[in-house]
Curated annotation (Swiss-Prot):
EC number: 3.6.1.45, 3.1.3.5
Pfam families to which the protein is assigned, alphabetical: 5_nucleotid_C, Metallophos
Gene Ontology cellular component terms for the protein in this record: plasma membrane
Protein name, per record: Protein 5NUC
Binding residues for substrate: 361, 399, 404, 427, 512-518
Protein purpose: Degradation of external UDP-glucose to uridine monophosphate and glucose-1-phosphate, which can then be used by the cell.
Site-annotated residues for Transition state stabilizer: 126, 129
Catalytic activity: UDP-sugar + H2O = UMP + alpha-D-aldose 1-phosphate; a ribonucleoside 5'-phosphate + H2O = a ribonucleoside + phosphate
Swiss-Prot/TrEMBL keywords: Disulfide bond, Glycoprotein, Hydrolase, Metal-binding, Nucleotide-binding, Signal, Zinc
Entries under InterPro entries matching the protein: 5'-Nucleotdase_C, 5'-Nucleotdase_C_sf, 5'-Nucleotdase_CS, 5_nucleotidase/apyrase, Calcineurin-like_PHP_ApaH, Metallo-depent_PP-like
């Protein structure tokens, strides 16, 4: 009963308080409820607040979120209560991000998506992570259409012949013909393994298909669902005159109106509205990522086929939302192998990986260098190449308190297991790219050593990549940063340059630091540019697998004058 009461209060509150662009309805008007998800990244099971594994301590504290079971509960409830007025759309990137997908790939993705049963989905770039051969079984196995209008699959016949891959579909919603068109960023050819698939620019493909749907299929309105990011969605809204509503993904953008419901800071209001040159207003929605929210967007269409009003907000899928038993039962046959995944050897190290308290909280440590370099690498390989920049984020700032254990591979012929890595990084935090002014970065570095002493190690002491820092902890607090050099990103050859207070830097950090953890409150109001596809432990795991055997060193990234001197004992 509590759930149903909360549910009705939630929907009533949305309807009452969040009406943002209503207009007087004319005769013949109707309503459509659009439910939407994007960038779920294999969060089939519930997660913690940072969208990684929900640990036992999180369950005890009722701090588990999302998962397909909670999405399913809400979708089923909306469909039961609202019937044919509901249109459930998914904007891609179901693949990649957890051991569930690593182990079971398209098999589990197909089964889980068929339980959710969206009316339609677009492809995401990560759907190509296992190549065309890893995507086609998914396209043939799902029981709903996958819409992507801007693909040229003529050189990949298995894609051309895929059962459920289409450019668009007509749906009857609230008794009216609604055209839905899908799209995918052409950057996918740089981000994943697309084989011989080619791409048409989104705007061109959408305009062509929208004209066809209007002329040949008698579509009354046009909704596009796709995976190109908020910046491109704004362009689509501006340059596609027949498009009425955009459901987006790819940029992992949290849009929200009002006070944030959890740790995610809204990038903009929900929906973002673009006004075309004709005066037509086009709303854009997106629902963050990782199944933590379900997008809810209710629109009013008048008798002329114009969007005249809307209301809605992403719904936080927290512990108050029950988990659908159908999903939980389906997951059980996969669970044991996933739980045993910790025993798997993920790589080899030729050196001790020092994550000890007396090393990483007083000095640069090689475990810190491994972790931060892995974050930089993960961002590089997920970012399109540029003629001017080798990456969009060359700097990582990571709190040493997040490093909880060393790994001594001498005990197992150099082998590193997933369980050992879990012990090093037990918190399961998301990774963000955050736009940080130079003066704020300097302030953060001052904070990182404001409590430094030779007797107590504090968690805020930094581990870094892309920085060379010189501290003097004998100086007064607030004046301990003596010099900082930053590895350039917008350059053809990386080199270290002095930190400039008035310059803005893209910095990779975890969700704990972004939320102000360990006293880093200066980062809380800053905007998140994007969320990396994998969490902290999955990112480091992938890096070790790719680069092994590894042998990270202490390289002089951090110099601490007046600090605790290293001893050989710290390495054992």
């Amino acid at each position: 009963m509590l759930f149903f009461l909360n549910f009705f209060v939630l929907v009533f509150s949305i309807e009452l308080a969040l009406l943002t662009a209503s207009a007087a309805a004319e005769d013949g008007s109707y309503e459509i409820i659009i439910l939407h998800t994007n960038d779920m990244h294999a969060r089939f099971d519930q997660t913690n607040a940072g969208s990684n594994k929900c640990q036992e301590k999180d369950k005890i504290a009722s701090k588990c979120y999302g998962g397909f079971a909670r999405v399913s509960t809400m979708v089923k409830k909306f469909r039961e209560e609202n019937g044919s007025s509901v249109l459930f759309l998914n904007a891609g990137d179901t693949y990649t991000g957890t051991p569930w997908f690593t182990l079971y790939k398209e098999t589990i993705a197909t089964e889980m998506m068929n339980i959710l049963r969206p009316d339609a989905a677009s492809l995401g770039n990560h759907e190509f992570d296992k190549g065309v051969e890893g995507l086609v079984p998914f396209l043939n196995g799902v029981t709903f259409p996958i819409l992507t209008a801007n693909l040229d699959t003529s050189q990949e016949p298995t894609m051309t012949n895929a059962k459920n891959l289409k450019r668009s579909m007509i749906f009857t919603v609230s008794g009216h013909r609604v055209g839905v068109i899908g799209y995918l960023t052409p950057d996918t050819k740089f981000l994943s393994d697309v084989g011989k698939v080619n791409f048409i620019p989104e705007v061109e493909a959408i305009n062509t298909e929208a004209q066809r749907l209007k002329k040949e299929e008698n579509a009354e309105i046009i909704i596009v669902v796709g995976h190109s990011g908020l910046i491109k969605d704004r362009e689509i809204a501006e340059k596609c005159p027949l498009v009425d509503i955009i459901v987006g993904g790819h940029s992992h953008t949290f849009l929200y109106t009002g006070s944030q419901p959890d740790r995610e800071v809204p990038v903009d209001v929900y929906p973002v509205v673009v006004t075309q040159s004709s005066g037509k207003k086009v709303p854009i929605v997106q629902a963050y990522c990782f199944t933590k929210y379900l997008g809810y967007f209710k629109v009013t269409i008048n008798g002329k086929g114009n969007v005249v009003g809307w209301t809605g907000q992403p719904i936080l899928l927290n512990n108050n939302i029950p988990q659908d038993q159908e999903v939980l039962t389906a997951l059980e046959k996969y669970r044991e192998r996933v739980e045993n995944y910790g025993n798997r050897v993920i790589g080899v190290s030729r050196v001790i990986l020092n994550g000890g308290h007396t090393e990483c909280r007083f000095h640069e440590c090689n475990m810190g260098n491994l972790i931060t370099d892995a974050f930089v690498y993960a961002n590089v390989i997920s970012t399109p190449m540029s003629t001017n920049a080798w990456t969009d984020a060359s700097v990582v700032l990571y709190q040493s308190g997040g490093i909880r254990a060393p790994i001594d591979p001498r005990t197992a012929a150099g082998s590193i297991t997933r369980l050992e890595l879990d012990n090093v990084l037990p918190f399961g935090n998301a990774l963000y790219v955050v736009k940080v002014p130079g003066n704020v970065l300097r302030k953060a570095l001052e904070h990182s050593v404001h409590r430094y002493s030779n007797t107590s190690g504090w968690g805020e002491f930094p581990q870094v990549s892309g920085l060379k820092i010189r501290f003097n902890v004998n100086e007064e607090i607030g004046k301990r940063v003596k010099s900082v050099k930053v590895l350039c990103s917008n350059c053809s050859q990386p080199e270290y340059q002095p930190l400039r207070n008035k310059k803005t830097y893209n910095v990779i950090m975890d969700s704990f630091m972004k939320d102000g953890g360990d006293g880093y409150s200066m980062f809380k109001p800053l905007k998140i540019i994007k969320t990396l596809p994998l969490g902290d432990i999955e990112t480091v795991e992938a890096y070790i697998e790719k680069m092994g055997p590894i042998f990270p060193a202490v390289e002089g990234r951090i110099t601490v004058l007046g600090g605790l001197q290293k001893s050989d004992e710290d390495w054992h």
